[in-house]
Swiss-Prot record:
Keywords annotated in UniProt: Acetylation, FAD, Fatty acid metabolism, Flavoprotein, Lipid metabolism, Mitochondrion, Oxidoreductase, Phosphoprotein, Transit peptide
Top EC class of this enzyme: oxidoreductase
Active-site residues, Swiss-Prot/TrEMBL: 414 (proton acceptor)
Cofactor entry: FAD
Family according to the record: Belongs to the acyl-CoA dehydrogenase family.
Pfam annotation, one family: Acyl-CoA_dh_1
Name of this chain's protein: Short/branched chain specific acyl-CoA dehydrogenase, mitochondrial
Gene: ACADSB
Superkingdom as given in the UniProt entry: Eukaryota
UniProt-annotated location(s): Mitochondrion matrix
Residue span of the annotated presequence: 1-33
One of the protein's GO biological processes: isoleucine catabolic process
Length: 432
């Protein structure tokens, strides 16, 4: 029975809710069925054993979560303020990520990786972001984007060449955005011209996260402009390749320890064996990877919101005004309760999207919902925390202002909040 249930869960198709116009709405309301469940799945789960709550973790997940929390508090927290001020990540922090196995979470153990689950990556990103969003981002890019792309689309030779290094020593970055190709990423102008057994890449990319520390760049370039966006191809480019230049890091509002740089390509010669997947399929890989990566950003923003909340509540339970603890004023209690409820909703959305991905089930809508809600909430809750703490919350002597600055990027990268709403609306339209 359990095996059959697993097969149904993994193979279930998205239920299209096309109700006949003659059907009375009171008999079968549209909301009666979850958009991510098929009828077979519903039957299988209704008669089977009770399903575990979303916040039930395996022993491995609990162990990873606990270890990362300890690492973040002991090896990241002491450097957070300095890294933010200097706009530079401490080498010891990056080395620690590799030593702890946090840069190759899903990479198979035969390549030197941890061999854990995608959900484990989500837990790691969340725990790191509670302490520092920049460190969480480095881990997020490596695990939810680069490692997964090479694992899914790479040849055995590419996996053997890059995955061991990505798991143990080499940070990475993905190059998609350009000056005129942000949300409209398929409008990219970077080109890749075939010359014998090589491709020559020319162009420039903008807003490239982790560019300053990356030893490997996954680059999207158009190999056939006559085919439009279907000419976009994905290349694996080593950081020391001649003609690849990383520019000066941007002076950003938040996530300052994470380098965000322009990257230019001047006659960069890449062997055709470094094409990831198939020529002209880069746009598919980009869409698929970003859909998955959005769950990572949701986890990051969830961590930012939770970290700020965890710091603020003890403060307002101690500080007194008018002879009472600030926390004891009903007006503030209502605000705290509202934020705590929204925080729990963001966590459930994020965990659900991650579990759906692991089960091989449709999760595009759920990933966008998680990213949208967690990102918007992070901005709101960090703003509220500053207000709750009063004047000290507005100073750099306390970390809540940094959480506030770090939160803003969540509504921008890997698809703005408006792009997420577009995606969610398209999915809803397809369901009815």
């Amino acid at each position: 029975m359990e095996r059959a249930t697993v097969r149904l869960l993994r193979g279930g198709a998205l239920l299209r809710r096309n109700f006949p116009s003659c059907l009375s709405s009171w008999k079968t309301p549209p909301h009666a069925l979850n958009s991510s469940q098929s009828e077979a799945q519903l039957k299988a789960t209704s008669n089977g054993p009770p399903l575990a709550p979303l916040q039930t973790f395996t022993d491995e997940e609990m162990m990873i979560k606990s270890a990362v929390k300890k690492f973040a508090q002991e090896q990241v927290a002491p450097f957070v303020s300095k890294m933010d001020e200097d706009s530079k990540m401490e080498k010891s922090v990056i080395q620690g990520l590799f030593q702890q196995g946090l840069m190759g979470i899903e990479i198979d153990t035969k390549y030197g990786g941890t061999g854990a689950s995608f959900f484990s990556s989500v837990l790691v990103i969340e725990e790191l972001a509670k302490v520092d969003a920049s460190v969480a981002l480095v881990c997020d890019i490596q695990n939810t984007l680069i490692n997964r792309m090479i694992g899914k689309y790479g040849t055995e030779e590419q996996k053997a060449t890059y995955l061991p290094k990505l798991a143990t020593e080499k940070a990475s970055s993905i190059c998609i955005s350009e000056t005129g190709a942000g949300s409209d990423s398929f409008a990219m102008k970077t080109r890749a011209d075939k010359k014998g057994d090589y491709y020559i890449i020319n162009g420039s990319k903008m807003w490239i996260s982790s560019a300053e520390i990356a030893g490997l760049f996954v680059v999207m370039a158009n190999a056939d402009f006559s085919a439009g966006y279907k000419g976009i191809t994905c290349f694996l480019v080593d950081g020391d390749t001649e003609g690849l230049h990383v520019g000066k890091p941007e002076n950003k509002l938040g996530i300052r320890a994470s380098s965000t740089c322009p990257v230019t390509f001047e006659n960069v010669k890449v062997p055709k064996t470094n094409i990831l997947g198939q020529v002209g399929h880069g746009y598919k890989y980009a869409i698929g990877s970003l859909n998955e990566g959005r769950i990572g950003i949701a986890a990051q923003m969830l961590g930012v919101a939770q970290g700020c909340f965890d710091y603020t509540i003890p403060y307002i339970k101690e500080r007194k005004q008018f002879g009472r603890r600030v926390f004891d004023f009903q007006g503030l209690q209502h605000q705290v309760a509202h934020m705590a409820t929204q925080l729990e909703a963001a966590r459930l959305l994020t965990y659900n999207a991650a579990r759906l991905l692991e089960a091989g089930r449709p999760m595009i809508k759920e990933a966008s919902m998680a990213k949208y809600h967690a990102s918007e909430l992070a901005g709101l809750i960090t703003s509220k925390c500053i207000e709750w703490m009063g004047g000290v919350g507005y100073t750099k002597s306390y970390p809540v202002e940094k959480y506030f600055r770090d939160a803003k990027i969540g509504t921008i990268y890997e698809g703005t909040s408006n792009i997420q709403l577009n995606t969610i609306a398209k999915c809803i339209s397809a369901e009815y």
